């Protein structure tokens, strides 16, 4: 006798919004691991990188991911970021590579003497290109999301790079549904963005749901800041150069995005828990990257940086 199947038994479980995003990202991670010879995951220590690491751990569990982490070190990150980087690398079992541009290091490039554009180009863009060439990586996972910024909004999930690591936004490959093209000539590479379709809200909800460790700078606390050019800049160490008349003030602030500390503005906030951060984000009327000084170097500066090889 044929058993009577209930409707619940024959209807597939309905995935939540976050579960669908998670499944898509895991599919992308596995696709690259299967199709590319030497992939790497870029690790900037921010909330998006934290989510990518968590997804990678899930995608290949119980084995460790078949690719290393790569951190491009500018030497100017927040101290809390370095502390988390060193702890996470060892706790999660990832192979962590750290690269510093030797030319920028020898010349003492910094955001105070050389400005944000030169600092970013030499430490980040050139440093990344050096590391990718040095280790021969043919695919690099990045944590960029389409809702962050207009040039990222139009970039493909699988983003083709020339042998000089350059991006041509007018010559992008079509992407149909979940079919991805990883073919490339020797010397060429891909930048792959597994969380491209996630929003800032998705990221925070997933971090809350999965209990993912993040840098404490995302939570409000009393911190020493100066108001400079319309931004609240945190005085994180004794290398910070105060201008005439500037006196650090203790204010309750947090960061929505993280980069080099002299180039990253905080926002005044009392959100000290994940639910409070999510609630504050839902009510925000400003961009997530409003505090990133490098985004305001010139018109369309992010797209120009990406064309030259930036993350």
From Swiss-Prot:
Q: Cite the CDD domains for this sequence.
A: Sulfate_adenylyltransferase_2 (cd23946)
The family database entries (PANTHER family) matched by this protein are listed as: SULFATE ADENYLYLTRANSFERASE SUBUNIT 2
Q: Which cysteines are joined by disulfide bonds?
A: none
Q: Which family does it belong to?
A: Belongs to the PAPS reductase family. CysD subfamily.
Q: Which GO annotations describe the biological process of this protein?
A: hydrogen sulfide biosynthetic process; sulfate assimilation
Q: What is this protein called?
A: Sulfate adenylyltransferase subunit 2
User: EC top class, in one word?
Assistant: transferase
State the function annotated in the UniProt record: With CysN forms the ATP sulfurylase (ATPS) that catalyzes the adenylation of sulfate producing adenosine 5'-phosphosulfate (APS) and diphosphate, the first enzymatic step in sulfur assimilation pathway. APS synthesis involves the formation of a high-energy phosphoric-sulfuric acid anhydride bond driven by GTP hydrolysis by CysN coupled to ATP hydrolysis by CysD.
EC number(s) on file: 2.7.7.4
């Amino acid at each position: 006798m044929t058993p009577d199947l209930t409707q619940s038994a024959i209807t597939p479980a309905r995935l939540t919004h976050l579960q669908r995003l998670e499944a898509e990202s895991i599919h992308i991670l596995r696709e690259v691991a299967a199709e590319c010879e030497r992939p790497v995951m870029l690790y900037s220590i921010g909330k998006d990188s934290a989510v990518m690491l968590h997804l990678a751990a899930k995608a290949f569990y119980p084995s460790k991911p078949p690719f290393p982490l790569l951190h491009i070190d500018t030497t100017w990150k927040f101290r809390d970021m370095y502390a988390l980087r060193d702890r996470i690398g060892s706790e999660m079992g990832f192979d962590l590579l750290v690269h510093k541009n030797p030319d920028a290091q020898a010349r003492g490039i910094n955001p105070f003497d050389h400005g944000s554009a030169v600092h970013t180009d030499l430490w980040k863009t050139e440093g990344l290109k050096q590391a990718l060439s040095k280790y021969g990586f043919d695919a690099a996972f990045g944590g960029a999301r389409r809702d962050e910024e207009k040039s990222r909004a139009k970039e493909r999930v699988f983003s083709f790079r020339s042998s000089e690591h350059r991006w041509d936004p007018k010559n992008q490959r079509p992407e149909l549904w979940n079919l991805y093209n990883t073919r490339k000539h020797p010397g060429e590479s891909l930048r792959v963005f597994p969380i491209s379709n996630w929003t800032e809200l998705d990221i925070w909800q997933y971090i809350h749901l999965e209990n993912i460790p993040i840098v404490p700078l995302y939570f409000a606390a009393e911190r020493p800041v100066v108001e400079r050019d319309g931004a609240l800049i945190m005085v994180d160490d004794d290398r910070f150069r105060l201008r005439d008349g500037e006196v650090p003030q203790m204010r309750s602030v947090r960061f929505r995005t993280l980069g080099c500390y002299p180039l990253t503005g905080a926002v005044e906030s009392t959100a000290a828990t994940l639910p409070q951060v999510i609630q504050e984000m839902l009510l925000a009327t400003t961009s997530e990257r409003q505090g990133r000084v490098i985004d305001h170097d010139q018109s369309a500066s992010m797209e120009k940086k990406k064309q030259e090889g930036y993350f």
